[in-house]
Amino acid sequence: MVTHPAAPVLVVEDDREQRESLCAMLDFEGFGHAEAANGREALDYLDRSGAPCVILLDLEMPVMNGWIFRAQQLADQRLSSIPVVVVTANDAGLSDRFPGVAGFLYKPLQFEKLAALLDRICPAN
């Protein structure tokens, strides 16, 4: 059996169905996970729980969107090194506007792409 890192994957997604789908994929691959419905909840989680293996970040969310979350993450020395994968339905030039992210996943999500990306970012022990 593959053993993944002890640190969970943080899923930041406001759409409950999308969030549950991502978490089901993570469960299937053997990854622990935590959930946040917006950037504010994600920052609160990070303050309480420490660094996940990677953050799967939606962009369009209420309360605090992914753009603002990412800016605050990069401004915080404790959080800036946590890898981020942007999860979005919009692929228009995002790589230019999100330098330094670990990858992009486009909706609708493809299980194989998610698994390959996570295996690269959070290798098995």
Where are these regions (language model features)?
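Alpha4 helix (beta4-alpha4-beta5 surface) of REC/receiver domains from two-component response regulators
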Residues: 68, 90-106, 112-116
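Short amphipathic alpha-helix used as the core "switch/output" element in two-component signaling
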Residues: 44, 67-80
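Active-site residues of response regulator receiver
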Residues: 57-58
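Hydrophobic/aromatic residues positioned on beta-strands within the core alpha/beta folds
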Residues: 85-88
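Receiver (REC) domain active-site loop signature in two-component systems and cognate sites
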Residues: 61
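Two-component/phosphorelay signaling modules centered on CheY-like receiver
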Residues: 16-34, 103
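Non-catalytic signal-transmission and effector/linker regions of two-component phosphorelay proteins
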Residues: 1-10, 110-125
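Helix N-cap/capping motif at the beta->alpha junctions
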Residues: 35-44, 66
